[in-house]
């Protein structure tokens, strides 16, 4: 699973996401993309599940790029623990995804297969998504 090798601060405040994506909202590498239609945090496990679903569908035909990276720590205290005694340990890592972010890209396969693979990946994610072709964004 994806996670940062080294971070300046181990724990971080949660914060909120708002607005549309200003960066990472265009297809850069592949021919097809999966664009977020909602704003949310996506966990490293969800990214990995989506990647596996796509790569299994396209077999050895094409190439997949993951355009998001989980670099936000999510902390959690153990179950049945009294309040206080400091912030809990890092439970998992999240990737912030805003509306319009290109999350995955694909190339080297026909459009129908790419759409099916992206649809499978979309079902693993907690946001509504849209399949886009590079010619659509120009």
Curated annotation (Swiss-Prot):
BP GO annotations: translation
Record carries keyword NADP: no
Region annotation Disordered: where it falls in the sequence: 1-21
A GO term, aspect molecular function: rRNA binding
Keywords: Ribonucleoprotein, Ribosomal protein, RNA-binding, rRNA-binding, tRNA-binding
Gene3D superfamilies noted in UniProt: Ribosomal protein L10e/L16 (3.90.1170.10)
Pfam families: Ribosomal_L16
Domain of life: Bacteria
Gene Ontology CC annotation, any one: cytosolic large ribosomal subunit
CDD domains reported for this sequence: Ribosomal_L16_L10e
Compositionally biased region (Basic residues): 1-15
InterPro entries for this protein: Ribosomal_uL16, Ribosomal_uL16_bact-type, Ribosomal_uL16_CS, Ribosomal_uL16_dom, Ribosomal_uL16_sf
Subunit structure: Part of the 50S ribosomal subunit.
Protein family membership: Belongs to the universal ribosomal protein uL16 family.
Function noted in UniProt: Binds 23S rRNA and is also seen to make contacts with the A and possibly P site tRNAs.
NCBIfam families given in the database record: rplP_bact (TIGR01164)
Protein name: Large ribosomal subunit protein uL16
Organism for this UniProt entry: Borreliella afzelii (strain PKo)
């Amino acid at each position: 699973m994806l996670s940062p090798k080294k971070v300046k601060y181990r724990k971080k405040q949660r914060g909120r996401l708002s607005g549309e994506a200003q960066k990472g909202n265009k297809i850069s590498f592949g021919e097809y993309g999966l664009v977020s239609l909602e704003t949310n945090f996506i966990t490293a496990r969800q990214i990995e599940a989506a990647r596996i679903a796509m790569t299994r569908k396209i077999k050895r035909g094409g190439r997949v790029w993951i355009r998001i990276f989980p670099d936000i720590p999510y902390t959690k205290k153990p179950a049945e623990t009294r309040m206080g005694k400091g912030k809990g340990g890092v439970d998992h890592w999240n990737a912030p995804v805003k509306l319009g972010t290109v999350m995955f890209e694909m190339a080297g396969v026909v459009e129908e297969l790419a759409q099916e693979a992206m649809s499978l990946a979309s079902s693993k994610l907690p946001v509504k998504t849209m399949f886009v072709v590079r010619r659509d964004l120009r």
